C-alpha cells in the first residue's frame, strides 16, 4: 500500500483533518500536519479507530439511489383521519398508486427504488375531469367554511406527491423539492418559494399552456378565490404533508405560476392594492407561525373568503403556513412571525455576555483556582486551545499587559504566569521529567511500573560506578591515570579535561576480583552541568583535594552536587608528596561542610594518596569498595532490555556518531534499536575503553556505541525500543520539545516602555554565534558559559546553531545569512570551507582552551554596546560685565577662573549656586575684538551664548564636554 496523506484519509473516513491528527497523536503516532504521509500500519490503526466511519463510507454507494425516490415511496403515508381535529375526511389512497400503477409498493426496499422511478414514466396520465377536481381528493367542506382558491402550479388533474415539502421546512436538512413519479405529469420543484434555491425562476414542466387548458377554469382576481377546504392538515407538523393527496382545485385557482412569463419581484401583487374580502382575517404567518384564517393569497396562510374559517383554521392550529414569495426575492412577507432562538444560540449569547472584555476583546476567565498545564516552550495557541479561546484575543490581551508576542511564538514561564494571573488561571509548566514521562506513556512505556514489578530473585550484583570530582588542577585525571596505568593527560590542552571519559578496571578485594567503573568529570566551573549529570549516574564520589591548596570553590561545588544526589563520598587527599602539604588542614576544612573523618568520629573515609608517586592507590580502591558494600545495594536485572546514560558523544570522521554510554540495567546487544535523547538508531558495533569489540554489555559497563542518527548530548538517557519507527517518533518528539523550550528560554522580552526606544536605536544589537566542537559535552559547556555573560540590556547573545564535528559549508552558509561568527573548539574547517568563509567574509575563530573563547566573546559583546558618555568639566568663568549687541545678543565679559573655555563647547550658567540655564553652547568666543578658539585661566574674554540673554554680573559660566566612557 502506498503512503497516504492524513487529509486524504480523513476525507475518506468522513472526519476532519484536525480530528485525524489528534486521533493519531492519541494512538501514539507522531504526525506534523494534515499534509504528512503515513505508513500502511498507521492507516490500518486509524481505520480501526473509526469503524463506523469506514462502514458508512462503504455503504454510501448503496444508499445513493434512494435520493431520486419520492418520499411517498420510501415510507408509508400516515393515516390522515386521526390527525384531522376539525373536519373528518375519508381515507385517501397513496398518490404513488394513483400516478404510477405499475410501480412497486411503497414498502419496497431501497434497491427497488430506482426500478420504481424508472417505471413511473410508463404509467398513463389520468384524464383531467371537467370539474377541475383531482382524483382521490377530499370531499368539499360545508358551506359555512368556504374554501380558499385552490393552489396550482403543476398539471391540474394530476395528484401531487404525498411526501413532505422540505422547501417550506426551515429545519430540514435539504431545501430541495422532491420530484414526483408522475411521468409527463411530474411536478418539478418550485424554487420561487425557496429563498435558499440558487435559481428563482419558475420552470414550466408542461410546456406553454393557455388559460383555457387549465382544469380549474379562469383565474380569479386577487383575493377573490374560490372555496377551499377549511379542514386543517393532518399531523400539524411544520410544513410536512402526509401521504394523502391534496384537495381538489376549486373553480378559481390561486394566482400562481402557470403559463406566461416567469415571475419577477415586480410581478408580485402589491399589498396595498389587493382588495380583501369583507370579514377576512389578517394574513397568516410567513411560513413560521400558525396560519390565520383568511388573508391575501400567497402571504403564508391559506387565503380565505369573507366569512372566515373557524378559529385556528388555515393550516390548522400549530401548523405552519407556507411562506410567501417575497422571501425568495428579498425581504420576507409582512405577516412573518417572530422566530425563536435555539438553545445553542442563547447559550452562545450568554457566554459572550458573561465573558469579560480586555483591550476590546472577550476572553474566558478562570476563577483564580483553575489549573492549566502547559509544556515547556508552549505558544499562545496552545494556551488558547486549553481554555477554548481565540489566540488573536490572547495576543491582544498580552499586548495590553506590556508584552509582545505572536500566536505561534514560544513563550517563557514568566510571560505565561503574567497572562494567567490576569485571566484567573494558575498555569503550571510541566517539568522535563513529567514531560518525558507523558511522552513515554504515549508509547506504553512505564519504567516506574517496570521497576516495581521486578523481584529480588531477578536482581544480580553489579560493579559500583565511581565519579572523580574536585577542583581544577588538583590531580583528578592523574589519579585516574595512576589507577588505569595509562596516560591521558598528555592529550589534554592546558592540563584541563575537556570531556568525560568512562573506564572500567579490575582489582582484588578480600581475595576476589572486583570491577569498578570510573567516570572522570571535568573540574572547571564551566562544566557544572556535566558534573551535575555525572553525580546523577554515580554510586560513589571520590572528592580529590590537593593537600597544598586545600578546599577551593569548585571543591565546594562538587561536594554540593554529590550531597544533593545522596551519593557517598570518599575523600582522596592528593599531592601529599609536595612541599607545603597539610592533610590535617584539609580534614578540618571539610569538617565544616559535613564531611567528618573517621579519625574524628565521623563516617567519611579519608585516604592520603600521591598520584605522581602511585602512593596508596590500592588503599583508595579498597575504601571505595568498602563504602559501596556498606552503604549501597548495588544490584540490577541483566535479563531485560538495556537502559542507561549517554556519558559522552562525538562525531568520528570514519565511523559517524560515536556515543559513550553507561548501561545501568538490562543488557545491551549488538543489533538493538535504541533512542538516546534526540538520537536514535540500531547498534551496529560496540567497543570497550580498550577498543575491544563487544557483542553485549551488562549493567555498569561503559561502552562505545556506533549507529546513531546524530550525536546525543552528554547526560541523555537511552533505552531499547521495540522497533525503529517507535525510536524515531520518540526522538522527533523529544527534539520538538527541546526546540520549543530553547526558543522560549532564548526569547528576549521587550516591554512597551522601551520598545519605541529600541526601534529608534536600530533595534537590539545581537551577536549570533555558531558553535562547533569535537565532543558534545564541550560544546554544551561552552554555550552555557557564553549565555551567562552579562553585559547589560543593550546586547543580546544568540547561539543559532551548535554541533559536533568539523566546520562545514552549511555552517558557513548559515553564518553568511545571519551574520554570525563561527567558534571552533578543537575543530578546524576543510580547505575548501575556509576559502568559502574568506570569500563570504565570515569570521571564524578557533580555540583549544575554554578560557580564551569566553574572554574573546565577552570583549566582543562589550564592544557592541552603545557608547556611554560622561561629563568632563573644561573650565569656569566669572561674568564681570554684560555687553549688549544687536547682532550677537548679550555678550558676557568674563574672566576665566579655572580650566579652559573652548568655543562650541557645552555650557551652563549658575547664579547664587543655582543653575538657571543648562544645555547651552558657546557660539562666540573673543579676546578683545579677535575671535579665539580657547581661553585659558586668568585671561579675560567675551562669551556669547547665542539666543540666551539672561546674563547678569556675578554669574558663573561652566563649560564641559561629553567624553566616551571606557568599559571595564
Curated annotation (Swiss-Prot):
Keywords: Cytoplasm, GTP-binding, Initiation factor, Nucleotide-binding, Protein biosynthesis
Ranges annotated as biased composition (Gly residues): 281-336
Segments for region (Disordered): 51-369
Superkingdom field: Bacteria
Compartmental location: Cytoplasm
Region of interest: G4: 574-577
Matching Pfam families: EF-G_D2, GTP_EFTU, IF-2, IF2_N
Main location: cytoplasm
Single GO MF annotation: GTP binding
Region of interest (G2), ranges: 495-499
Residue numbers spanned by region G1: 470-477
Biased composition (Low complexity): 51-76, 93-102, 113-122, 128-170, 239-254
Start and end residues of each stretch annotated as G3: 520-523
Family from the record: Belongs to the TRAFAC class translation factor GTPase superfamily. Classic translation factor GTPase family. IF-2 subfamily.
Function per UniProt: One of the essential components for the initiation of protein synthesis. Protects formylmethionyl-tRNA from spontaneous hydrolysis and promotes its binding to the 30S ribosomal subunits. Also involved in the hydrolysis of GTP during the formation of the 70S ribosomal complex.
Protein name, UniProt field: Translation initiation factor IF-2
Species name: Arthrobacter sp. (strain FB24)
Amino acid at each position: 500500500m502506498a503512503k497516504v496523506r492524513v487529509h486524504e484519509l480523513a476525507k475518506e473516513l468522513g472526519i476532519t483533518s484536525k480530528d485525524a491528527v489528534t486521533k493519531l497523536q492519541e494512538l501514539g503516532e507522531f504526525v506534523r500536519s494534515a499534509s504528512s504521509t503515513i505508513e500502511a500500519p498507521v492507516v490500518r490503526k486509524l481505520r480501526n479507530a473509526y469503524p463506523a466511519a469506514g462502514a458508512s463510507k462503504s455503504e454510501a454507494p448503496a444508499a445513493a439511489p434512494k435520493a431520486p425516490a419520492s418520499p411517498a415511496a420510501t415510507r408509508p403515508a400516515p393515516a390522515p383521519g386521526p390527525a384531522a381535529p376539525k373536519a373528518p375526511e375519508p381515507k385517501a389512497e397513496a398518490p404513488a398508486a394513483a400516478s404510477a400503477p405499475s410501480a412497486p409498493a411503497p414498502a419496497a426496499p431501497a434497491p427497488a427504488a430506482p426500478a420504481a422511478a424508472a417505471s413511473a414514466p410508463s404509467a398513463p396520465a389520468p384524464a383531467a375531469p371537467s370539474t377541475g377536481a383531482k382524483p382521490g381528493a377530499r370531499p368539499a367542506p360545508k358551506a359555512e367554511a368556504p374554501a380558499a382558491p385552490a393552489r396550482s402550479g403543476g398539471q391540474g388533474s394530476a395528484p401531487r406527491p404525498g411526501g413532505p415539502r422540505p422547501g417550506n421546512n426551515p429545519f430540514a436538512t435539504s431545501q430541495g423539492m422532491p420530484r414526483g413519479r408522475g411521468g409527463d405529469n411530474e411536478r418539478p420543484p418550485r424554487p420561487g418559494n425557496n429563498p435558499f434555491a440558487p435559481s428563482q425562476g419558475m420552470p414550466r414542466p408542461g410546456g406553454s399552456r393557455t388559460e383555457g387548458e387549465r382544469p380549474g377554469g379562469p383565474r380569479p382576481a386577487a383575493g377573490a378565490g374560490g372555496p377551499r377546504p377549511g379542514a386543517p392538515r393532518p399531523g400539524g407538523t411544520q410544513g410536512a404533508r402526509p401521504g394523502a393527496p391534496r384537495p381538489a382545485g376549486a373553480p378559481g385557482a390561486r394566482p400562481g405560476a402557470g403559463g406566461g412569463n416567469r415571475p419577477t419581484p415586480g410581478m408580485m401583487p402589491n399589498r396595498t392594492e389587493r382588495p380583501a374580502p369583507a370579514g377576512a382575517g389578517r394574513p397568516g404567518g410567513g411560513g413560521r407561525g400558525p396560519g390565520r384564517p383568511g388573508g391575501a393569497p400567497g402571504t403564508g396562510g391559506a387565503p380565505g373568503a369573507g366569512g372566515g374559517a373557524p378559529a385556528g383554521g388555515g393550516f390548522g392550529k400549530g401548523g405552519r403556513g407556507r411562506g410567501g414569495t417575497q422571501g425568495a426575492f428579498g425581504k420576507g412577507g409582512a405577516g412573518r412571525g417572530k422566530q425563536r432562538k435555539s438553545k445553542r444560540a442563547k447559550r452562545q449569547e450568554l457566554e459572550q455576555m458573561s465573558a469579560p472584555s480586555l483591550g476590546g476583546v472577550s476572553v474566558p476567565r478562570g476563577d483564580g483556582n483553575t489549573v492549566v498545564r502547559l509544556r515547556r516552550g508552549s505558544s499562545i495557541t496552545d494556551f488558547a486551545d486549553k481554555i477554548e479561546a481565540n489566540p488573536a484575543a490572547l495576543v491582544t490581551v498580552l499586548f495590553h499587559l506590556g508584552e509582545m508576542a505572536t500566536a505561534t511564538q514560544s513563550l517563557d514561564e514568566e510571560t505565561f504566569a503574567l497572562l494567567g494571573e490576569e485571566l484567573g488561571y494558575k498555569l503550571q509548566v510541566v517539568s522535563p521529567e513529567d514531560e518525558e514521562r507523558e511522552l513515554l506513556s504515549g508509547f506504553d512505556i512505564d519504567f516506574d511500573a517496570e521497576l516495581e514489578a521486578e523481584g529480588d530473585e531477578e536482581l544480580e550484583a553489579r560493579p559500583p560506578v565511581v565519579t572523580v570530582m574536585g577542583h581544577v588542577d588538583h590531580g583528578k585525571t592523574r589519579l585516574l591515570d595512576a589507577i588505569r596505568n595509562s596516560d591521558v593527560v598528555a592529550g589534554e590542552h592546558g592540563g584541563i579535561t575537556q570531556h568525560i571519559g568512562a573506564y572500567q578496571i579490575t582489582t582484588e578485594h578480600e581475595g576476589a576480583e572486583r570491577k569498578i567503573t570510573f567516570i572522570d568529570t571535568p573540574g572547571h566551573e564551566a562544566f557544572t552541568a556535566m558534573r551535575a549529570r555525572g553525580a546523577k549516574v554515580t554510586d560513589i564520589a571520590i572528592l580529590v583535594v590537593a593537600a597544598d591548596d586545600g578546599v577551593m570553590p569548585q571543591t565546594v561545588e562538587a561536594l554540593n552536587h554529590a550531597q544533593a544526589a545522596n551519593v557517598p563520598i570518599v575523600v582522596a587527599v592528593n599531592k601529599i608528596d609536595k612541599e607545603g602539604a597539610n592533610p590535617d588542614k584539609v580534614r578540618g576544612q571539610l569538617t565544616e561542610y559535613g564531611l567528618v573523618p573517621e579519625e574524628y568520629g565521623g563516617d567519611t573515609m579519608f585516604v592520603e594518596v600521591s598520584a605522581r608517586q602511585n602512593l596508596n592507590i590500592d588503599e583508595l580502591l579498597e575504601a571505595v569498595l568498602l563504602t559501596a558494600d556498606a552503604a549501597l545495594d548495588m544490584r540490577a536485572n541483566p535479563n531485560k532490555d538495556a537502559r542507561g546514560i549517554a556519558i559522552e558523544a562525538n562525531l568520528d570522521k570514519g565511523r559517524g556518531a560515536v556515543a559513550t554510554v553507561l548501561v545501568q540495567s538490562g543488557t545491551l546487544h549488538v543489533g538493538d534499536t535504541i533512542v538516546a535523547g534526540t538520537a536514535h538508531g540500531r547498534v551496529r558495533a560496540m567497543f570497550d575503553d580498550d577498543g575491544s569489540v563487544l557483542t553485549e554489555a551488562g549493567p555498569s559497563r561503559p561502552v562505545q556505541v556506533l549507529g546513531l542518527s546524530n550525536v546525543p548530548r552528554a547526560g541523555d538517557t537511552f533505552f531499547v525500543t521495540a522497533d525503529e519507527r517507535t525510536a524515531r517518533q520518540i526522538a522527533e518528539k523529544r527534539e520538538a520539545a527541546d526546540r520549543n523550550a530553547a526558543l522560549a528560554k532564548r526569547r528576549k522580552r521587550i516591554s512597551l516602555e522601551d520598545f519605541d526606544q529600541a526601534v529608534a536605536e536600530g533595534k537590539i544589537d545581537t551577536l549570533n554565534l555558531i558553535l562547533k566542537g569535537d565532543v558534545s559535552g564541550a560544546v554544551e559547556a561552552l554555550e552555557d558559559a557564553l549565555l551567562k555573560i552579562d553585559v547589560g540590556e543593550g546586547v543580546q547573545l544568540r547561539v543559532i546553531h551548535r554541533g559536533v564535528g568539523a566546520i562545514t559549508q552549511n555552517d558557513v552558509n548559515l553564518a553568511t545569512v545571519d551574520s554570525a561568527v563561527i567558534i571552533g573548539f578543537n575543530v578546524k574547517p576543510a580547505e575548501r570551507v575556509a576559502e568559502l568563509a574568506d570569500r563570504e567574509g565570515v569570521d571564524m575563530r578557533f580555540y583549544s582552551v575554554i578560557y580564551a573563547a569566553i574572554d574573546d566573546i565577552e570583549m566582543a559583546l562589550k564592544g557592541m554596546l552603545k557608547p556611554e558618555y560622561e561629563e568632563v568639566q573644561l573650565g569656569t568663568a566669572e561674568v564681570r560685565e554684560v555687553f549688549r549687541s544687536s547682532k550677537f545678543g548679550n555678550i558676557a565679559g568674563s574672566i576665566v577662573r579655572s580650566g579652559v573655555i573652548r568655543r562650541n563647547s557645552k555650557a551652563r550658567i549658575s547664579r547664587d549656586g543655582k543653575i538657571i540655564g543648562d544645555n547651552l553652547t558657546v557660539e562666540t568666543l573673543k579676546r578683545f575684538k579677535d575671535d579665539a578658539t580657547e581661553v585659558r585661566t586668568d585671561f579675560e574674554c567675551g562669551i556669547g551664548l547665542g539666543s540666551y540673554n539672561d546674563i547678569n554680573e556675578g554669574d558663573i559660566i561652566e563649560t564641559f564636554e561629553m567624553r566616551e566612557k571606557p568599559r571595564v
